Amino acid sequence: GPGINERRYTDTPISFSDLLPTISDIAGNKILKRKDLDGGSFKKLLFNKSDKVFRKTKGLIFHVPYENKIALERAHSAIIVDNYKLIKFYDNNDTNLYDLKNDISESIDLSKIYINEKLTKKLEKILDNYLEEVKAPKWQPGITWKENPLKIINSFH
């Protein structure tokens, strides 16, 4: 589009939740000031004014509170901050930490290495606090979340 450099590349992660704030920002609306939006505008990223997306939460957070055939086949939540991605599985409470800059395939779990234990705990705390703040649905064995409304299940962080 106009004002966007041709063939521009960035490794700054964005997510679907960033689209509404970005479109709104480009259109000149003030929706960005709403506190109930998870995403942030990447308008400045598009127009080479910044290499970051500013969100109310630190990093990108993903939450899959049910078993499925697509997302790792296990209930989990994940957070990406800077180069690191932490995944927390709910069926056995495993936590994995990956350095996305040096291990894009997420094949080397760094969470159990002594030097990374502090970072693992820090990211897990940020993730847990966010899930609690938004009252995210909580996984329970045998629940698919597709057959019953969340109000009936009544299981939240």
Q: Language-model segments: which ranges?
A:
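C-terminal cap/loop subdomain of S1 sulfatases and analogous C-terminal strand-loop tails that border
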Residues: G3-R8, T12, S17-L100, K151-S155
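Intrinsically disordered, low-complexity polar regions and short flexible loop motifs
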Residues: D103
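Long, internal low-complexity/basic segments
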Residues: L19, N93, S107-H157
